[in-house]
UniProtKB/Swiss-Prot annotation:
Superkingdom, natural source: Eukaryota
Alphabetically ordered keywords of this record: Glycoprotein, Secreted, Signal
Compartments reported by the entry: Secreted
InterPro entries in the cross-refs: BTB/POZ_dom (IPR000210), SKP1/BTB/POZ_sf (IPR011333)
Lineage: Eukaryota, Metazoa, Ecdysozoa, Nematoda, Chromadorea
Source species: Caenorhabditis elegans
Name listed for the protein in its UniProt record: BTB/POZ domain-containing protein Y57A10B.3
Name of a matching Pfam family: BTB
Length: 316
């Protein structure tokens, strides 16, 4: 098989991964399991649901049992999801009261987090019966709310007023023009008269989104993070603000939970060449090449596809 054909085979292999919708729940049910009370810890059930692997363990002796659920979600896009919350409902037998049902709260922020529940019995019992189900809700990362009225109030060095959705943002036309071709052209169009107190409407963006972009440009309140970086890239591209693109790229290069595939797509879409190069170099083994999702490769631009394919050939 030629090197190029082998490379193509690597590219079309799928990596099991999951990205969650806005209100999507993760649910799983395990019916009754019988297990003995011999000492030691044992795994009695393993499941994978929507990218979450759950290992159900039990440590038991004749009088007590400790149920443990270990949730492994390293195949969930942590760039989008900060954790999971919900509950586990466990059913188990007792010597005196028959079947019992208990609900255990779940709040996961660690991709390898464990939830424990202890069961005590009043007398010897050699055999246990138990079942459980869980329902988890992904906790999406969100942009932090900002006090835009406070950060963009009228002050001496702000000579222009942007009107977005009927609300005002007081800005420095000189400073904003330096960082944004869009605003340079906008203010130049209106410079036949003094900009002082002139209200300039801005269309095609919400008040909160434009406030987010301007707060990063002015370094007044916000810096790029995993919660706002996708939106900032979109806004920086729309309003031709390379300074913000650079800030977001620096964040994604050094301090992000994003999957490498996510970084590769963002880098290619917004022309972040340092990030694109790093994300390609991270594919540093044949195994990682096999794991590249075909949907990701097909979404890349032609020039990025060439770079990825050439890099993979070097691994052969």
């Amino acid at each position: 098989m030629s090197a190029m054909r082998r490379c193509t085979c690597f590219i079309i292999c799928l990596l099991t991964s999951y990205t969650y919708g806005t209100t999507e729940l993760v649910e799983y049910t395990r019916g009754d399991i019988e297990f003995d009370s011999s000492n030691g810890e044992k795994i009695i059930d393993i499941s994978t649901t929507k990218g979450i692997r759950c290992e159900w363990k039990v440590s038991s002796d004749y009088y007590t049992a400790c149920f443990k659920w270990k949730f492994i979600w390293d195949q969930v896009d942590k760039y989008e999801v900060a954790g999971f919350s919900g509950q586990i409902t466990v059913n188990y037998t007792t010597d005196s009261e028959g079947q019992k049902t208990r609900t255990v709260k779940v709040n996961l922020t660690d991709p390898g987090g464990e939830i424990w529940y202890n069961v005590s019995r009043s007398r010897y019992l050699s055999t246990y019966y138990a079942s459980y189900n869980y329902t988890l809700e992904p906790q999406k990362r969100h942009m932090e709310a900002m006090e835009l009225d406070k950060y963009f109030a009228p002050v001496d060095d702000r000579d222009a007023v942007l009107i977005v959705e009927g609300k005002k943002l007081h800005v420095s036309s000189c400073f904003l023009s330096f960082h944004s071709t869009y605003f340079h052209d906008l203010f130049e169009y209106d410079n036949s008269t003094s900009l002082l107190n002139i209200e300039i409407p801005v269309e095609g963006v919400s008040y909160e989104d434009l406030g987010l972009l301007l707060s990063v440009v002015h370094s007044t309140a916000t810096f790029p993070n995993d919660g706002n970086s996708k939106k900032l890239l979109e806004l920086a591209s729309q309003f031709q603000t390379p300074y913000v693109l650079g800030l977001v790229e620096n964040h994604l290069l050094t301090n992000t939970f994003a999957w490498n595939e996510t970084l590769m797509l963002l880098a290619d879409k917004y022309g972040l060449m340092r990030l694109l190069g790093k994300s390609i170099r991270r594919i540093d083994s044949i195994e990682k090449a096999r794991q590249l999702k075909d949907s990701v490769f097909l979404e890349l631009s032609d020039s990025a596809k060439v770079k990825v394919a050439y890099h993979m050939i070097q691994l052969l």
